[in-house]
């Protein structure tokens, strides 16, 4: 995960959302590929760290089936990346911070363990979660500017109980 964090820090320095990924061999841990987000600099919505690392690994190995490989990523994969991980037949996934907005391994969906798919993989989240989340928090805080106080939200009136009134029955 340290190597994935290094990749995330490179992304942050480039103004990219700091997510890093590393593909490694399961038998000896040898790193086969590493990548970081490049969506902004490439104007490519698919240029997520996981997808780029999987592409590199498949190219290097000469096969798209990477069942004897693992993937470490600093943020829980989104639907696209989780799908790519399943399609690449990755044998093991390790991720750092959970993603409450897009996480599709454990948080919002469980795509990597979906029983209807033809491949499921071992996965473990929360590895170095504080460090991984910290890189993201620092990046977005700097982007927003720390000195800015949070915007006050207007108070909302409570919702009425029961169904809304029917205008056709107005008396």
Where are these regions (language model features)?
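Zinc-dependent deaminase
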Residues: 1-11, 84-171
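Immediate flanking context of iron-sulfur cluster ligation sites
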Residues: 63-76
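Short, basic and Ser/Thr-rich N-terminal targeting/leader segments
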Residues: 15-19, 67
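A structural microfeature
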Residues: 32-33
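Short beta-strand scaffold segments in enzyme catalytic cores
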Residues: 19-25
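Glycine-biased flexible loop/turn sites that connect beta-strands or occur in inter-domain linkers
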Residues: 28-29
């Amino acid at each position: 995960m340290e190597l994935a964090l290094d990749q995330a820090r490179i992304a942050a320095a480039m103004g990219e959302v700091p997510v890093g990924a590393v593909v490694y061999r399961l038998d000896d841990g040898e790193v086969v590929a590493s990548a970081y987000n490049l969506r902004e600099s490439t104007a490519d919505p698919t240029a997520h760290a996981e997808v780029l690392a999987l592409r590199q690994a498949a190219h290097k190995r000469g096969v798209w089936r990477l069942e004897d490989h693992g993937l470490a990523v600093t943020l829980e994969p989104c639907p696209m990346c989780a799908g790519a991980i399943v399609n690449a037949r990755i044998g093991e996934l390790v991720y750092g911070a959970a993603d409450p907005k897009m996480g599709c391994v454990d948080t919002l969906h469980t795509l990597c363990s979906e029983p209807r798919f033809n491949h499921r993989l071992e996965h473990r989240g929360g590895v170095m979660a504080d460090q991984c989340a910290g890189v993201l928090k620092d990046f977005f805080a700097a982007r927003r500017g720390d000195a800015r106080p949070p915007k006050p939200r207007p108070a909302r009136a409570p919702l009425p109980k029961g169904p809304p009134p029917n205008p056709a029955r107005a008396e």
